[in-house]
């Protein structure tokens, strides 16, 4: 009886193991955004009140200067190549310039007024791809 149960379990396990398709893409969370870096582009980012978000720059970059049009409604914490951001007030829109040891980044940042947690355009992580 024990062998029969073990046999059924193994058949079920093997069948399910082969049903996984390694060529199907993994689901991507829309709140993690990757932008193609272009020095002539302004990147638009929307943040949720009370949530921490991160802007990640290239691995060989370090933040040197951050300038905000209206700094009051934002909490910023730079750490090496990452900039941690938190919106403090709803419905605020301003610009931000980040200068690293390699590049200049221009942003238009906005704090969300919606209470919908599933808003697609909210950014939790912003990363950059650098074409050669």
Feature-to-residue mapping (PLM):
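Cleavable N-terminal signal peptides
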Residues: 6-7, 17-18
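A general "mature secreted/periplasmic domain" signal
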Residues: 18-132
């Amino acid at each position: 009886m024990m062998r029969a149960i073990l046999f059924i379990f193994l058949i079920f396990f093997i069948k399910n193991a082969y049903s996984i398709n390694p060529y199907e893409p993994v689901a991507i969370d829309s709140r993690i955004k990757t932008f193609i870096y272009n020095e002539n582009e302004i990147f638009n980012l929307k943040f949720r009140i009370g949530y921490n978000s991160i802007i990640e720059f290239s691995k060989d970059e370090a933040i040197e200067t951050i300038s905000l049009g209206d700094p009051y409604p934002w909490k910023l914490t730079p750490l090496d190549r990452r900039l941690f951001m938190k919106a403090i007030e709803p419905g605020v829109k301003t610009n931000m310039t980040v200068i690293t040891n390699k590049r200049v980044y221009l942003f238009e940042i906005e704090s969300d007024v919606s209470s919908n947690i599933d808003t697609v355009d909210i950014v939790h992580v912003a990363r950059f791809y650098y074409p050669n």
